[in-house]
A protein has these predicted regions:
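Short, glycine/charged-enriched secondary-structure capping and boundary segments
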Residues: 20-23, 47, 72
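Local sequence-structure signature of Cys/Sec-based thiol-disulfide redox active-site neighborhoods
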Residues: 1-28
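Short beta->alpha junction loops/turns
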Residues: 12, 35-38, 74
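Non-catalytic, surface beta->alpha helical segment in thiol-disulfide oxidoreductase systems
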Residues: 59-93
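Thioredoxin-like thiol-disulfide oxidoreductase module
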Residues: 35-53, 81-92
Length: 93
């Protein structure tokens, strides 16, 4: 099974900048989707999350027979960036 981490961010968001630094410090590989730069990506993000809070985390677990996705959003699934990092680490373990 392989696990992929996608984070949804905005360049103007200071929490997003801090979050990316935390993930890099922890050695966590991730794909950064800047929804501020891509209107289509932004619309999909809002539709899926039902809000526009960032940074949000999408975890994709790909297995031989099944594929699972988990979406975590601020103020819904975590309040602190350290909690988001812990959630990601749990999926990567």
């Amino acid at each position: 099974m392989s696990t992929h981490v996608v984070i949804y961010t905005m360049q103007s968001c200071p929490h997003c900048v801090d979050f990316k630094k935390m993930l890099q410090t922890e050695g966590i590989d991730f794909v950064d989707r800047d929804i501020e730069k891509n209107e289509e990506e932004y619309q999909i993000f809002v539709e899926v999350t039902q809000n526009d809070y960032v940074p949000a985390v999408l975890i994709i677990e790909e297995g031989v027979e099944k594929h699972k996705s988990f979406l975590y959003a601020p103020d819904r699934d975590y309040n602190e960036l350290t909690e988001a990092v812990a959630i990601i680490k749990k999926h990567l373990a």
